[in-house]
Each structure stands twice: as C-alpha cells, then as structure tokens.
Design a protein with these regions (language model features):
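Juxtamembrane loop-to-helix connectors within ABC transporter transmembrane domains
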Residues: 2-3, 11, 43, 77, ...
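Transmembrane helices of ABC transporter permease
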Residues: 13, 17-27, 133-188, 257-271
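Transmembrane helix-loop-helix hairpins at lipid-water interfaces of multipass membrane proteins
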Residues: 18-73, 80, 153-158, 267-273
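Hydrophobic alpha-helical segments in the permease module
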Residues: 63-70, 74, 167-171, 240-254, ...
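Short intracellular "coupling" helices and adjacent cytoplasmic loop segments at the cytosolic face
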Residues: 86, 94-118, 122-124, 197-221, ...
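Cytosolic ends of transmembrane helices, especially the final helix of ABC transmembrane type-1 domains
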Residues: 204, 214, 238, 286-313
C-alpha cells in the first residue's frame, strides 16, 4: 500500500478537520465502551443490599446517555471524515485533469481515452474510499480493539487469553487476502478501462458503425469484454466471499470459547455475573473490528491499486517543457526559420520529416503541398511545439522555439487543424475561444499547469485561454465584433444568421449539427478571431466547395496581410498566390519557390497541378479551362 503515500499532500490542507474527525472516533468509542461497564455495575448492584432503586435507575439513565452521546459522536465522525474525503477526491480529480492538459500530444497518441476516463472516475472514487471511510474505520477499529481488549484484560486476563486463541492466525490471513484483493481489483480496473474505451469509440464513431453495418459485430465484441469484466469481478467476489467468512469463523470461535470458559469462571467465583456479561459485550465489540478489518483491508488495497494507476499518469512528465528562463516575446514579426529539421514520432524509427530547411519572411504566405503522407501536417505541427524536432531547430524572429514559453508561443499562433473540433457550446463561444474575453465557461481551456506553487488556477486558465498584455498584437476591443468579423471572412456569418438563435445556437457534441464545411469554416473563424501573428491552415478548406473556397481565399488576402501564414492544401490551385511554395515528398522538401518558378521546372509541383486540373476538368464535364503559366487550370468558379 505504499502507493497511498502520495496521497499525503492532499491530506495536509485538511489536517484540522481530519484531527477533529478522528477525535470524534475516540470520543464515540469512549461512550460505547462506557455502556457495558455501567451495565456491569448495575447487574452486580442488584445483589448489593446497600444499593437502592434510584441508584440502579441512575445507572440506567447513564447507559442511555452514553448511547446518545456515542451516537452523536459517530454522526460527527462520519460527517467530518466522509465530507473531507469528498474534498480530497475533488482536489485529486482536479489535479489529474490539470496534469492531463500539461501532457504533450504524443502522450495522448499512445494512451486510450477510455483508460483516462476510467482513472478520472473509478480510480478517484476508490482513492476517496481509502482516504475517507477506510481511514475512519481503521482508526475506529484500532481504538475499539484497544479499549475493549484493555477492559477484557482488566476483568479477567486468563479469560482474555483463552478467548483470543483463534486470533493468532488472523495476521497471515489478512496479509494473504490483502495481496489477492489488490491484484484482483487492479485487473478489474484495467478491464473497465478497455470497456470504457470501446463505449467511447462506438459513441464517437456511431455513423461509421451504422454505415458499415457493424452493430452486431460491435455487440459481440462488447459482450465478450463485458463478460471478461464480470468474470474478474466474480473472482474478486470469491476472494472477498472467502475472506469475510473466515473472519466470522474466528470471531465466532472466540465467542464460543468465552461462553464456555467464562461460565466456569463465574461458577468458580473468579468473576461476577456482571463481569461475565460485560466481558461478552466487550468481546462482541472486539468481534466487529475483526469483521470490519476485512472490509477496511479491501478498501485500502483497492485505493492503493487505483492510486498506483493515477500515479502512473501524474508521474508522467511532458516532453514539451517551458525553459527555466524563457525569452519573452515582444512585437512578434513572424519570421520563421527551419534549420535542418528532422522528426520521428516517439517510439518509431522512421523519420517523417527529413532535413527540412527554409526561411519564411515576416508577413509571407508559405504554402506546403505534396502527396498524401508526405509529412505536411507534421511539419506545421512543429511550429506551435505540439512536438519538438528530433534533430535541427526552428526559430521565430531569430529565437529558437525551445527558448520560448510554449504558452506564450501558442498565444501568437492561430491554427486550423485538419480535423475540425467544436465544443458543445454556442457558436459565439466556439468562435470566440481564442479572443481573450472569457465566456461564462472557458471551453476546454486550462493552463495545463498543476498549481503546485499555490497560484490561482483560474488565472492560469486565463493565461492558457488567450493572449493578453500590451505586447500581443491585435488585442480585441470588442469580442462580439471580432467574432462576427472572423465569421464573415470564413463565409459563415450569413449562414449563422439563418439559424433560429444565430450566434447563440448551441452545438451538439463536436459540432455534429453542422455540416462538414460549416465546421471547417467555424474553426477557421476561431483562428482568425484571435488575430494571431502566425496563422496555420492545415487543409482547412478540404470540406468546402470550390466556389466557397474561392470566396474565402479572396477575403483571406486582406486577413493574411501583415501576418505570416502557412497554408496546407490538397488543391494546388488554392496556393498558387503564395509567396513561397514548399513541395514535400517522403518528408523532404524536393522543390520550393513561387508558383511560376516551380512550373518552369516541370517537376513534382507541375505534375501535381496538371493532375488536379485534369481531374477538375473531368469532374466539371469539360467546363471552363484557362491557361496558367502553360498549364491548363480549371476555373475555381466553375
């Protein structure tokens, strides 16, 4: 159970509450222990001629009072300690979530979402049970055992020694079953993670499941996983089911021995009837801790297994870390330089980017084209430091990216990824995500930093949410105006106005109630709304028809003016006006230059353009075709 040591920092802020709760544990046991002793005095007093009826009545009243005070102390014991464990659970879950946001993209590429969800829910619950009820009953069991045993020895040391003979084999039973329960519970949690992952994937990919008629196959897979989960739980039930009866057998044996030997003690006059009755009450109080011990051990073992699973995530350090003394960004010009940059994904040997070198001048538009799998998206993902190069370096305005705070770097970059992601909030909040005036609820935002230094998490969230300060270019004066202006550039404003609630339309999960093109335009508007110094469009218009694409590109000319931009597109016609075009093939820059320069070389770029023009001509049924630098181009408006 050494894993639970890492829970100590979470207990320290509540040490006063825990101390008060544990004092209630001791107090409740004092009152409970007093009851049998008062009963002994009353019974023994029945044969004493000097005792009056009022004396017996007074003892009876004290017994009732002790029971009431013991019950009140137990109530506050549970109220304080269980309430504290709930707060500890909330703190642990918050830290777990903050830590997840600190981790780099590579971590999530190798970790199942369902597994993380299981740790954030089931495992934190198991840790709470160990931090609250298990601690409470462990102390209660220890105190009750100590008080009861002390009074039993005081009544009759010999009877106590005989009655406790069955307890000799208790420690090895507890240790042995404790290890079994720990192992079984960890296996259950691992299987629950697998089960959660499958449910999450099926809910997310429900359209694919139905499109490929995979319902029955997925049901069979789920049934198999669920059956395995059930079998693992049944194995734990069997272990616990054997553990508790063994404890009951030991305690029952102790009671039988006490009745037999204690009866002889009364007959021989060594103890009184009151002593005998009180002894059996104390033995019963001793029996409950023995029975509860199995439950407490089970809770601690489950909590230990779950804390171990949480620790494996909490102890994972992000590969992308801010430098100790980061260089501040002032008046970003946007000059980007790649110097012999190579990259391979963690855990792989194949380089997907190989020796790439180029310079993007401040305010220039750089296009990246190439066949599928050539490394285009990977190349631009290195700019906001989603990954770090395996070799070489990237500079922003002459400063290596590794010398910059990643949060500050990302605050000046607007990125439109290939996969459009929208939150289950209003369109206004989605588009305004990076504007800097936080909505009622910061959508999925966080600093991604665990507040170990006692800082205010909400301030960290604001820092990760949007750029701030006088040195950040284009800080918005009005959030709504910026949102709507960005939507106009993305050709989405008029569409939004047709919705009954306009910008206040609440989106479904991942924006499912929008079309693919509308989702792409919304993510484009989100990037534009924050007015970044550097804009990255990763195939951002692939789901948009050519007519809408042409209008967006026309409006983007004004939006891109004065800012460095990187455009990835599978349509070569969308990047012909770029200041520099990079042609990637198998991770290498095989050509670079302007549109005219690359056409003149009749290389890979010219081949890609000819192929696409032919495809557009065939799709358009031989529609309008014009000559562009000696290459036939299908009209964007055709």
């Amino acid at each position: 159970m050494t894993e639970l040591k890492t829970l100590l920092p979470y207990l320290r802020p509540y040490r006063r509450a825990i101390g008060l709760g544990l004092s209630m544990v001791v107090l409740s046991n004092v009152f409970i222990i007093a009851g049998p002793y008062l009963l002994k005095l009353a019974i023994d007093g029945l044969g004493d001629p000097g005792r009056t009826r009022s004396d017996i009545a007074a003892l009876a009243a004290l017994i009732v009072l002790a029971a009431l005070l013991g019950g009140a102390a137990k109530f506050w014991m549970r109220e304080i300690l269980n309430g504290t464990s709930r707060r500890i659970e909330a703190d642990l879950r918050n830290d777990f979530f903050r830590h997840l946001l600190r981790l780099d993209v590579a971590f999530f590429g190798s970790t199942r979402t369902g597994d993380l969800m299981s740790r954030a829910t089931n495992d934190t619950l198991a840790v709470r049970m160990a931090a609250g009820p298990a601690v409470m009953y462990a102390v209660n069991t220890t105190v009750s055992f100590a008080f009861s045993l002390a009074l039993m020895v005081w009544i009759s040391p010999r009877l106590t020694a005989v009655a406790l003979v069955p307890m000799v084999i208790l420690p090895p039973i507890v240790l042995g079953f404790g290890r079994i329960i720990h192992q079984k519970f960890e296996e259950i949690q691992e299987q629950f993670s697998t089960l959660s992952t499958m449910v999450q994937e099926n809910l997310t990919g429900l359209r694919i499941v139905r499109a490929y008629v995979q319902e029955e196959d997925q049901e069979r897979q789920f049934d198999a996983l669920n059956a395995d989960y059930m079998q693992r739980n049944l194995a734990l039930v069997k272990a616990s089911g054997l553990f508790h009866p063994l404890l009951m057998l030991l305690s029952g044996s102790a009671m039988v021995i006490a009745l037999w030997y204690g009866g002889h003690q009364v007959i021989s006059g060594r103890i009184t009837i009151g002593d005998f009755i009180a002894f059996n009450f104390y033995l019963a109080l001793l029996t409950w801790p023995m029975i509860a011990l199995g439950w407490v051990v089970s809770l601690f073992q489950r909590g230990s297994a779950s804390m171990g699973r949480l620790n494996r995530i909490l102890e994972t350090e992000p590969r992308i870390r801010p430098p100790t003394d980061p260089t501040p960004l002032h008046h970003v010009r946007g000059e980007i330089e790649f110097q012999e940059v190579s990259f391979r994904y963690p855990g792989t040997e194949r380089e997907v980017i190989r020796g790439v070198s180029f310079v993007a001048g401040a305010g220039q538009t750089v296009a990246v084209v190439g066949p599928t799998g050539s490394g285009k998206s990977t190349l631009v993902s290195l700019l906001p430091r989603l990954y770090d190069p395996s070799h070489g370096r990237i500079l922003l305005d002459g400063i290596p990216l590794t010398e910059l705070d990643p949060l500050e770097l990302r605050s000046v970059i607007g990125m439109v990824p290939q996969e459009s992601f929208l939150f289950s909030e209003t369109l206004r909040e989605n588009i305004g995500l990076g504007v800097g005036l936080p909505p009622a609820r910061a959508l999925g935002s966080s600093a991604g930093r665990r507040p170990e230094d006692g800082s205010n998490p909400s301030r960290e969230i604001e820092r990760g949410y949007a750029p701030s300060g006088p040195d950040v270019p284009g800080k918005p004066e009005g959030r709504d105006e910026r949102v709507e202006d960005a939507a106009r550039v993305a050709q989405l404003h008029e569409t939004i106005l047709t919705f009954p609630k306009g910008y206040e339309t609440v989106l479904g999960e991942r924006g499912i109630n929008l079309s693919g093109g509308q989702r792409q335009r919304a993510t484009l508007a989100r990037a534009l709304a924050r007015d970044p110094s550097i804009l990255i469009l990763d195939d951002a218009l692939s789901a948009v028809d050519t007519h809408t694409e042409a209008r967006i590109l026309e409006d983007l000319k004004t939006a891109l003016a004065g800012r460095t931009s990187f455009i990835i597109s599978h349509r070569v016609t969308a990047v012909m006006n770029a200041d520099r075009i990079l042609v990637l093939d198998e991770g290498r820059v095989v050509e670079q230059g302007t549109h005219a320069e690359l056409l003149a070389r009749s290389g890979t770029y010219a081949t890609l353009l000819r192929r696409q023009m032919l495809e557009e001509e065939l799709e358009g049924g031989g529609g309008a075709v014009q000559e562009v630098g000696g290459v036939r181009e299908g009209s964007l408006h055709g």
